[in-house]
Amino acid sequence: MIMKQEPTTYQPEEIEKKIYEICSHRGYFEIDGNEAIQEKNKRFCLMMPPPNVTGVLHIGHALTLSLQDILARYKRMDGYKTLYQPGLDHAGIATQNVVEKQLLSQGIKKEDLGREEFIKKVWEWKEKSGGAILEQMKRLGVSAAFSRTRFTMDKGLQRAVKLAFLKWYEKGLIIQDNYMVNWCTKDGALSDIEVEYEERKGALYYIRYYLENQKDYLVVATTRPETLFGDSALMVNPNDERYKHLVGQKAILPLIHRTIPIIADEHVEMEFGTGCVKVTPGHDFNDYEVGKRHHLETIKIFDEKGILNAHCGEFENLERLEARDKVVERLKENALLEKIEEHTHQVGHCYRCHNVVEPYVSKQWFVKPEIAQSSIEKIQQGLARFYPSNWINNYNAWMRELRPWCISRQLFWGHQIPVFTCENNHQFVSLDTPLSCPTCKSETLEQDKDVLDTWFSSGLWAFSTLGWGQEKSGLFNESDLKDFYPNTTLITGFDILFFWVARMLFCSESLLGELPFKDIYLHALVRDEKGEKMSKSKGNVIDPLEMIEKYGADSLRFTLANLCATGRDIKLSTTHLENNKNFANKLFNAASYLKLKQESFKDKERLNEYQTPLGRYAKSRLNSATKEARNALDNYRFNDATTLLYRFLWGEFCDWFIEFSKVENEAIDELGSVLKEALKLLHPFMPFISESLYHKLSNTELENTESIMVMPYPKDLAQDEKLEHEFEVIKDCIVSLRRLKIMLETPPIVLKEASVGLREAIENTERLQTYAQKLARLEKVSVISSKPLKSVSDVGEFCQTYANLENLDLSPLVARLKKQLEKLEKEKLKLNLHNENFVKNAPKSVLEKAKESLKTLLEKESKIKQELDLLEQP
């Protein structure tokens, strides 16, 4: 029989899929997956921000999911009944666009299909292609309760959306009104935060508006000359002496000769342009408010597709942006254009299709800002905490400026607004499809054609996924809402603080009377190693799936957590990933070494079972690492947790404990137990290698024993500070002795003996001597109280080490040092500072650099001369 040879390096691709499938199949990711270690009344709930059903895993997702999964795994191991709730967002605009393009490639328009047939096509696409991101999450090791995956268009969630709408409608918090909205001619109405502003180079057009006498004119500056057809007035500041005499008179609208009044309002900035502005209430947010104050007519000059209408005269049927150049040309022809200036300004674009957004008066459904008042007050009372804490300032600033939230969208795909109107114009909200009007019993009913903003349904995510309003429907577990609302923690990117987090806060508080979570952790953005935003055009995008393929999921998870310093953007490079793959390999080698050396491994869970000094020291350091890891995780300091685990496992365990074990062989079993416990600390960050190495050290296989993920997380136990200090002194002495050897050993000189002077006494100097002789590779190390007469020394933190020079032939070392002095002398000459002409004529920066180099060379020269003086003493 051919025996399978064990790999000599860590191979993540060989174990990750197998481990994940076993753990998933056993139900470890579910609410009661850790039932054996659950503690009474300990609950933890974490909601996955639902990615778009159209989405693929990008590095931002990978960061959010890694941090969430770290926390979920930690809480499971710590005895919490844990719900890590996954799901998908129906992504109204994005999904409709995907399916529309697919149909157009077949020559089919959605309008030809009609609403019902188009929605069927979307559901077909969703079942076939949607949700690929969920499978990609599993590659990352995400341990969400996938059997409970929710979709914002699920039957249960649709009911919650209708119920929320009904409750707010009945309270007067949802209204329908004509209002100025952000309008995308492709995607319809957008909320304020769905508009992305970009700085653009444009033009400022100075247009002449003649007065009624047709002799005098006013000049008005505008960036959008095509909107002049919607002007209802000209406006000046009442304090502007240039125009006071004109207030109350009329001006003639260029090109179409309609008369408009000249009004005064302090809204006008006298310094901008000419100090006289056009007022277009139908197509400007500020002008809309001015129009209401002055009772001006609101004129819409284009339709929902951006096509100019009859108000625009000869320009009717032109697209709004296409019309601009033609309007400017006609103004020039009629001597109505004073001048054009270059002008840089902010232009709003649709966050989805990047179309230029227009202010547009439209009849839409809105949620009133009053809905948020109670949640704002509770945040002020500290009932939810932001991490980092400075994000509360951003939240407060935005909430102070909260405007009515436009929730209606002109789409087919989404939650159709549950408002019905009968033939007698009675309007009502219904949770189910009504048979008749409750007011007049008319059976001729029409449902509102618009759908709700995607963020409306995702704003209910914290409780709609738990069965709110339909606990007894059979679609949800009856106890879910009671057990897991409020949720415990929210982890997401700061970029959706206003899109999603703020809305969840006020939606949840308004409907359930409690904030949806206690802690809100907002992470920064992932950028490239130079700190630049990743983009396909720059070619600097890091694909998480490719990184998993190359470096393993553990390396990616650990790297992202390690770089996630509070409040700072993450600068990610493949060097980080390579380093952490090396870290995984270091652990693999350490476990392989211990397994090779051990005769038998026995679990040693209790502190008093650690008998050897090295074992007790290693356990004490493990207890320290446990305390730090727990504290870091409890306070969302993911980078601190990874830093200390890296330091403990590589810097202490691999670099020192393993080395010490070569002297103290009987500690091998105990070091194995320490490493197994340390792997539990590491598990939330690196679930695959921790699982694999734990079983390797235990001589077990995951296939026939419990997973590390449902074992208790190590407890914070007492440390032996006295023993720890003793080993710190030993380590310091070894490092100092090694430096001494490097300084002295020049063939044929071999340092065989050295001595150590301690700044303060330790209990066991024999242990120090034993370790120092073996690990510094010396035949003899003495502990002394005074410096030998003829010796060279090295100074450590806790010690000073000495090499006696009396019995050594130092001539090779002296020759080496003299050669170094000659080399330094040549380097000094190359600096040219002895040359008066150079010093006089060299640029200041060059001269300063040369002087700095000379300073460094002189310092080296001084040290070498000191060593030579010591070595050449009689």
From Swiss-Prot:
Keywords on record: Aminoacyl-tRNA synthetase, ATP-binding, Coiled coil, Cytoplasm, Ligase, Nucleotide-binding, Protein biosynthesis
CDD domains attached to this UniProt entry: Anticodon_Ia_Val (cd07962), ValRS_core (cd00817)
Transmembrane segments: none
Protein localization: Cytoplasm
Entry's Gene Ontology BP terms: valyl-tRNA aminoacylation
Protein name (database record): Valine--tRNA ligase
Source species, domain of life: Bacteria
Function statement: Catalyzes the attachment of valine to tRNA(Val). As ValRS can inadvertently accommodate and process structurally similar amino acids such as threonine, to avoid such errors, it has a 'posttransfer' editing activity that hydrolyzes mischarged Thr-tRNA(Val) in a tRNA-dependent manner.
Organism: Helicobacter pylori (strain ATCC 700392 / 26695) (Campylobacter pylori)
Subunit structure: Monomer.
Top-level taxonomy: Bacteria, Pseudomonadati, Campylobacterota, Epsilonproteobacteria, Campylobacterales
Positions in coiled-coil regions: 813-873
Span(s) of short sequence motif 'HIGH' region: 51-61
Pfam families with a match to the protein in the record: Anticodon_1, tRNA-synt_1, Val_tRNA-synt_C
Family (UniProt): Belongs to the class-I aminoacyl-tRNA synthetase family. ValS type 1 subfamily.
Enzyme Commission (EC) number: 6.1.1.9
Gene Ontology cellular-component terms listed: cytosol
Motif 'KMSKS' region boundaries: 533-537
Reactions catalysed: tRNA(Val) + L-valine + ATP = L-valyl-tRNA(Val) + AMP + diphosphate
